[in-house]
Amino acid sequence: MPVTDRSIPSLLKEQADQRPNETAFTFLDYDLDPNGFAETLTWSQVYARACVVADELTMYGVPGDRVAILAPQGLEYIVAFLGALQAGFIGVPLSTPQYGVHDERVSAVLRDSQPVAILTTSAVVGDVTKYASSQDGQPAPSVIEVDLLDLDTPRPQQALPQPASGSAYLQYTSGSTRTPAGVIVSHENVIANVTQSLYGYFGGPDKFPADTTVVSWLPLFHDMGLILGICAPLVTGCTAVLLSPMSFLRRPARWMQLLASHPKCFSAAPNFAFELAVRRTTDEDLAGLDLGDVLGIVSGSERIHVATIKRFTERFAPFNLSPAAVRPSYGLAEATLYVAAPEPGTTPRTVRFDYESLTAGHARPCRADGSVGTELISYGSPDPSAVRIVNPETMIENPSGTVGEIWAHGEHVAMGYWQKPEQSDRTFNARIVNPAPGTPEGPWLRTGDLGVMSNGELFIMGRIKDLVIVDGRNHYPDDIEATIQEITGGRVAAIAVPDNITEQLVAIIELKRRGASAEEAMVKLRSVKREITSAISKSHSLRVADVVLVPPGSIPITTSGKIRRAACVERYRSDGFNRLDVTV
């Protein structure tokens, strides 16, 4: 069946017909049992329950209406999401409000998407109902507790309705809570992107082992968690073993144990998770276990630190983890998820580039004589018709070695932003001026990320809007943060704070206060500040205007763990950080 004729509901029906009694999803609940209480659904059960939810939803709206999912990580979340799509509605995956604190992001998304219903569970309905209010004169969304529906009693089968637009769900990007942007992801986008990733990670769908197990603790409302944990199993028919993000954070060794105890595992995580796994997994945790069967672990969603990959592979090498297991990957919600990754079976590769040249916008590899430079990780050689480096001002392709904006093209590129036509046109409908032979003129997705092609390989610098421009030179905050993290190990935000003449570099650094006394702690803080200032000067030829040491948890982040640099600047300028070094 051609990709354009398929949908997520049709894929679910296919899996239920072809492998009705095979396990589709297993959720391990570590709150019920420290060893993980397993709840499992077969493909036929998932389909039947999704149909029940779909039938229920038909009483509240029509295909094309939005339905928000605000439920805890678990099987009910999966059934709710698939049920919404089964009814032809547009899903809006969201996180559950936590601990009774008002979640402005949830409120903003509900205002923007105006769902006719909210799917939740009885465990959190009290918190969720507070958000089910009337918006802009529209009726308040109905709140449906999925676990209280009679999910195991089949309802009359109905023809699968589809929204006229082909929209599957709105993936709200992690950015400002005041102006959320919902990426409109179609059924075609999802299927095309999963298929594209199968080529990127395995060499093609036909080379994807049928007995693969997806292992994921990533939140299902996040693009990487949604595609890996729900959509990839739908496309491939593989089994997914899931746990909650909190279960991972409380005990990172659980992730490694699951990777070692299931056949042919494939997983994904942001950079910080690899660090946690290294620091908080003991040899005893993996006693008698073997990681030699792990097919791959995608590293994505945030800046990938070369040192982290090295530490991770070295730490778990005694348990037979392949040096090629970690798969550095580049992607974004506007492209559904996946954009580029190195060739299957290759170990992560890095190249050192001359820092001075990079600040001038040119990638010049350092000589092989130990020259100090900026070490960047390769994201492989993407299809030239799908990825281009473009001058964001002139819209002309950049030659190899020249830094520019990464543009993406293909069936995986999403449809636009929900109810934001002008922003959608600027971002999703770009045109290359005088394209080279073989390069599509458009439409191209402007990613907002800076990258460069060098010797046919893609390297990434960071977000255009996050550039630190000092004395007319471009500095990449990700590089500066990597330098600092090698010293401190915690979360770091390198930000540009404007003064009357230029921008000044300020480093916000999370650090645990250590010392037998207040005086000893201050001595250690002074030492850390001196070491950081020296390292940045040496590695980046850059003076730090201020080094701000703060307690862990102080730096504003998005729901996916990315640093909110604009919020950091605002908080810094208003003296909003609780500084550990105020007397230093």
Curated annotation (Swiss-Prot):
The keyword Ligase applies. GO terms for biological process: Actinobacterium-type cell wall biogenesis; fatty acid biosynthetic process; lipid biosynthetic process. SUPFAM superfamilies: Acetyl-CoA synthetase-like. Its EC number is 6.2.1.59. Keywords: Fatty acid metabolism, Ligase, Lipid metabolism. Belongs to the ATP-dependent AMP-binding enzyme family. Catalyzes the activation of long-chain fatty acids as acyl-adenylates (acyl-AMP), which are then transferred to the multifunctional polyketide synthase PpsA for further chain extension. Catalyzes the adenylation of the long-chain fatty acids eicosanoate (C20) or docosanoate (C22), and potentially the very-long-chain fatty acid lignocerate (C24). Involved in the biosynthesis of phthiocerol dimycocerosate (DIM A) and phthiodiolone dimycocerosate (DIM B). It comes from Mycobacterium marinum (strain ATCC BAA-535 / M). Pathway: Lipid metabolism; fatty acid biosynthesis. Coiled coil: none annotated. It is an enzyme of class 6 (ligase). GO terms for cellular component: plasma membrane. The gene is fadD26. It holds the Pfam family AMP-binding. This is Long-chain-fatty-acid--AMP ligase FadD26. It catalyses: holo-[(phenol)carboxyphthiodiolenone synthase] + a long-chain fatty acid + ATP = a long-chain fatty acyl-[(phenol)carboxyphthiodiolenone synthase] + AMP + diphosphate; eicosanoate + holo-[(phenol)carboxyphthiodiolenone synthase] + ATP = icosanoyl-[(phenol)carboxyphthiodiolenone synthase] + AMP + diphosphate; holo-[(phenol)carboxyphthiodiolenone synthase] + docosanoate + ATP = docosanoyl-[(phenol)carboxyphthiodiolenone synthase] + AMP + diphosphate. Gene3D superfamilies: 3.30.300.30, N-terminal domain of ligase-like. Disruption phenotype: Deletion of the gene produces selective loss of phthiocerol dimycocerosates (PDIMs). InterPro entries: AMP-bd_C, AMP-bd_C_sf, AMP-dep_synth/lig_dom, ANL_N_sf, FAAL/FAAC. One of its GO terms (molecular function) is adenylyltransferase activity.
